[in-house]
Amino acid sequence: MGNILNKLKLTAALIAFASASLAQAQSNVTLYGIIDTAIQVGHSGGKTTTRLDSSSVAPSRWGLLGSEDLGGGLSAVFKLEDGFNANTGTIAGNGAEFNREAWVGLRGKFGQVQLGNNYTPLFTTYLNYSLGELNTLAWGNATNNFVFVPTARTANSIRFVSAPVGGALVRLVYARGANGTTGEPASLGDTLSAGINYVHGHFSADADYLQQRFSQTATLSQTSPVATGRYYLFGTSYDWGRVKAAALYQMHRNATGITAAVNSTYANPNNDFYEVNALIRDIAHGTVLLSFGQYRLSANGNGNASSYAIRYDYHLSKRTGVYAGVAEIRNHSAATFSVSNAAGAGIPVTAGSNLTTFIAGIVHKF
């Protein structure tokens, strides 16, 4: 209880600080947020599950985003963002106060550099090509069902995004994973990632690489063996106006000693997955998402899965939208994939069971 009260006091203090800053320095600090709640009904293995969920299409969150003009085209920037569960009022993820993003940096003609808890180039590419109207990389997107979370966000990191030149820009991230944590290998979770984005008119393409140190053992010590997994990601899209189409393809290699299960925090078996998806706009004044994707486990085809979805997004206003859809996961005998929320797990399934899920929800931005 004391820990919760301390977090509430910190949150209240930060909101008061943001309000004071807004009054004294115009709009250099912005308080923002999103609340998303939905009803899901899932059918799997002869069982029906009905539940109220948070963060299905858009992760429920609040945050502070700020900047200070330092002169000469240079600005100090920061972002603090906390995820929460709208259906229960609890803090999401690992329970940290700012579990989504927490960084400070500098922005200038060179681009932007950030130090703290940052997104990787892979995650930015997932967002760019796993399409959606109310939000991207969300309920219904195949990539959202298959992505390995530790490759998306990394603490103790430095992130650099260059200024665009000729339609191209570069993203770089370096992170110390365990960062000296007692009882873990010193290099566990160390991450190095680079990506390039190119935009020309209505066409966009990304290519990314990420390597991450993992352990092959579930019980960790400072002397546990550590190896390096390597991820290769490619994405592309084209926007015709009424229709936008996109595709993602990712390979994971060099997962020494990892065959069918995640054995430690950063361990992930060799696999490939892809998603092809499209947005069709102006359908009954809303937008339809169509998504299909497949996951292939390199060591054993019994771990394969396929994902199918259709979702309808409708804006009630600039800040409020509603959505509804149906999605299906077809698991091979050893796979346990579900239709995941934008933040948080989907309805659980047993190994080899298929899942069909219906959803209806509302999202509001402030």
How should each PLM-predicted stretch be described?
Residues 30-32, 75-77, 112-116, 169-171, ...:
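Residue-level detector of the transmembrane beta-barrel scaffold of outer-membrane proteins
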Residues 187, 193-314, 326-328:
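Detector for outer-membrane/organellar transmembrane beta-barrel domains
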Residues 1-25:
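Gram-negative bacterial Sec-dependent N-terminal signal peptides
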Residues 18-24, 62-70, 108-112, 162-166, ...:
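Outer-membrane beta-barrel proteins
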Residues 47-51, 145, 180-182, 219-223, ...:
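Extracellular loop and loop/strand-boundary signature of outer-membrane beta-barrel proteins
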Residues 39-47, 84-90, 121-123, 178-182, ...:
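Gram-negative outer-membrane beta-barrel proteins
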Residues 316, 350-366:
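Outer-membrane beta-barrel "beta-signal"
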Residues 26-42, 49-177, 188, 196-204:
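Outer membrane beta-barrel
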